[in-house]
Amino acid sequence: ASDVDGRYRGTDLHVHQLKEDEGLHYTVFSLWDTFRSLHPLLSWIEPGRTRDFVRTMLRMYKEGGQLPVWELAANYTGCMIGYHSVPVISDAKAWRIKGFDEELALKAMVQAADSAHLGLDVYAEMGYIPSERESEGTSKTLEYCYDDACIAQFASNLGNSEADAIAERFRLRALSWRNILHPESHFIQPKRSGAWARDFDPTEVNFNYTEANGWQYTFFAPHDISGLMALTEGKSSFSTLVENQFTAPSLTSGRDQPDITGLIGQYAHGNEPSHHVAYLQAYTGNHWRTQELVDEILNTLYTSEPDGLCGNEDCGQMSAWYVLSSIGLYPV
């Protein structure tokens, strides 16, 4: 977004000037998509670019008052869910990428997580977002939990008592996803205030989930896979649940959702919530099954034709999944 002379439009919609040592300023942060594969890949192969991404995010916080969620041309947009600048910043520190203000980064991340909008207030109070209180509350609960885990990891590596207290607070809050895993069905299900929503159908696309259904969001606790396996009665039962997603009929109910494409059973590779699921079989000891599933996705859902992607490229996420999977890696 910065011009050749270092000028850029900030999220306060004023023009600012970069200093010579401040790198580049970026735009188009499709973070709900790209935090999963693209940014982890770039942290590995382009650490200097990731440093500038983080610097850009922190400038957006200073100039506009909050970290980007889905920023476009200096506009916040309010599109999609989560506060997924957080995993990008946390991953940068995990890779020991230097050149950004870590104390400011922690302050910005905590501000994002402690905001009172988009169900965050009730999430902090109740440990989940009741379906009657907020649209897409089930998905928001899960993604807030993951982002909280990333805050905890970042803070725990700062090495001071104040950051340690922040790390512990968010480590505990990151486990809140367990409040919406049904103990009998083993699905992540919508929950009202104090009671499970009735007539749950894991194939139904509705207002409780973000561009997905119960099948596609049940496996989103990447920071707590061991807990997910334990609450679904262990590795064998969990392995069966994952397998059933890939062998279930490829039919959805509820509203029409054009983003749910590239189906193998109820696994939807054309949209991001499913992207890590094939790799979960490795956690159950069935590495061979992960290999089979990843190979099937690579060879059936990507081609070199003009329509060679089974879904939206989403600013590099679909291609980054292919690159990482082609070399046998994935950042669950």
Language-model-detected regions and their locations in the chain:
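Beta-sandwich/jelly-roll carbohydrate-recognition scaffolds of carbohydrate-active enzymes
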Residues: 1-26, 277, 311
